[in-house]
Swiss-Prot record:
It comes from Pseudomonas putida (strain GB-1). It comes from the Bacteria. Keywords: Ligase, Phosphoprotein, Pyridine nucleotide biosynthesis. This is Nicotinate phosphoribosyltransferase. The gene is pncB. Its EC number is 6.3.4.21. Belongs to the NAPRTase family. GO terms for biological process: NAD biosynthetic process via the salvage pathway. The modification Phosphohistidine is found at H224. Catalyzes the synthesis of beta-nicotinate D-ribonucleotide from nicotinate and 5-phospho-D-ribose 1-phosphate at the expense of ATP.
């Protein structure tokens, strides 16, 4: 019989997280070690998660004893932009559960983080992975790894049947599926199969532990929280995106050069993404809105600045599958470089399983609200409607209501 899809422990070491958490954490250590933040959990589809509270708490408490393994340190030391002082800090880092509140509120599971950004930043990914896997264990206790593996091979067959050899040689796909994975075992199996048998180009994973374990490239630069936090880190609101990008440039000196565009909107982002940033950053990441229309804006912006789009890369990561990735690839092929980060559709696509729609987002920085407006109304997030209205006014973003 095939192996179970579940291990006894859900998060088994400190690096079972997304790579951009480490890159942002280093930026926080060097630039904002005293910043305080708040985060709030949301289940977008209203699923009742109250029955899972006890096991969620149990798995959460087990984060206490996670540390950086000695065997993992040489792997991180080979990544040139992770500095020795940050790795020393990471070696000493421990999750502190006094920054976490979890319980029932208004007949729903609630989860809040409040504390120093430097000590809270690593909670997001393992907490979401815990909630997802605890729920999946309860609903699908007899799931076997073979069911996830077979589904993945069916996708490979589809891709071979619908893409030419030339397209397969150029189509780049990465695993971005940690936070809403079916289980840790399923993600590891999926990434292993992608590494060994993917018919196109498998370029890496966002999961640092799997990158270390399977000898593949860890991928990621920045998340929304990096830009959102800068709304309350000192500069005028109108200058917050510029401050976030400038701080990133100073931290990484041209490395990790994929910028996220939809914290406010693509139009607002491009207003700040001048020739200086357009030359320094290697490309842009799409995470909301219609992807090809977004790409056309990016291409036009580069051309307006006198930059050849074929020297830049667009990374797509918004709810993708292989079918949609191939469509986008074909629409943009030969005009700009593209790459695709696929999450839930790789790590939680099993017949009979409905993946979760859960997020854990920053709501406050230094005691004041932060917001993500995005290029998709459903992804707008802020606890303070007045702040969202003010941000729309400052960046001249029309209401989507």
């Amino acid at each position: 019989m095939s192996e179970s899809a579940f291990a006894e422990r859900i998060v088994h070491n400190l690096l079972d997280t997304d790579f951009y958490k480490l890159t942002m954490m280093q930026g926080v250590l060097h630039n904002y070690p005293d910043a305080d933040v708040e985060w709030e959990f949301r289940c977008r589809n209203g699923e009742d998660l109250r029955p899972y509270l006890g096991e969620i708490r149990n798995q959460l408490e087990r984060l206490n004893d996670l540390t950086l393994d000695d065997g993992q340190l040489p792997f991180l030391e080979r990544i040139s932009f992770l500095k020795p002082d940050f790795l020393r800090f990471l070696r000493l880092f421990r999750f502190n559960l006094r920054y976490v509140r979890v319980g029932i509120e208004n007949d729903q599971l609630f989860l809040r983080l409040k504390g120093p950004w430097l000590h809270v930043i690593l909670f997001e990914v393992p907490l979401l992975a815990i909630i997802s896997e605890v729920r999946n264990r309860q609903l699908h206790p007899h799931m076997r790894l073979a069911e996830a593996r077979d589904q993945l091979y069916r996708k490979f067959d589809w891709l071979r049947a619908h893409a030419s050899d030339e397209e397969l040689a150029e189509l780049q796909v990465a695993d971005f599926g940690t936070r809403r994975r079916f289980s840790s075992r399923v993600q590891e199996e999926v990434v292993r199969v992608l590494r060994d048998d993917f018919p196109a180009r498998f370029v890496g994973t966002s999961n640092v532990d799997l990158a270390w374990k399977l000898d593949i490239k860890p991928l990621g630069t920045m998340a929304h929280e990096w830009i959102m936090a800068h709304q309350q880190l000192g500069p005028r609101l109108i200058d917050s995106q510029i401050a976030a990008l400038d701080c990133w440039v100073r931290e990484y000196r041209g490395l990790l050069g994929i910028a996220l565009t939809d914290c406010i909107t693509m139009d607002a982002f491009l207003g700040d993404f001048d020739l200086y940033f357009a030359k320094l950053f290697d490309g842009l990441r799409h995470d909301s809105g219609e992807p090809v229309a977004w790409a056309e804006k990016a291409i036009a912006h580069y051309q307006k600045l006198g930059i050849d789009p074929m020297t830049k890369t667009l990374v797509f990561s918004d709810g993708l599958n292989l079918t949609r990735s191939l469509e986008i690839f074909r629409a943009l092929r030969g005009r700009i470089n593209v790459s695709f980060g696929i999450g839930t559709n790789l790590t939680c696509d099993i017949p009979g399983v409905a993946p979760m729609s859960i997020v854990l987002k920053m709501t406050d920085c230094n005691g004041a609200p932060v917001a993500k407006i995005s290029d998709e109304a459903a992804k707008t997030q802020c606890r303070d409607e007045n702040f969202v209205a003010y941000m729309r006014h400052v960046f001249k973003v029309p209401s989507k209501e």
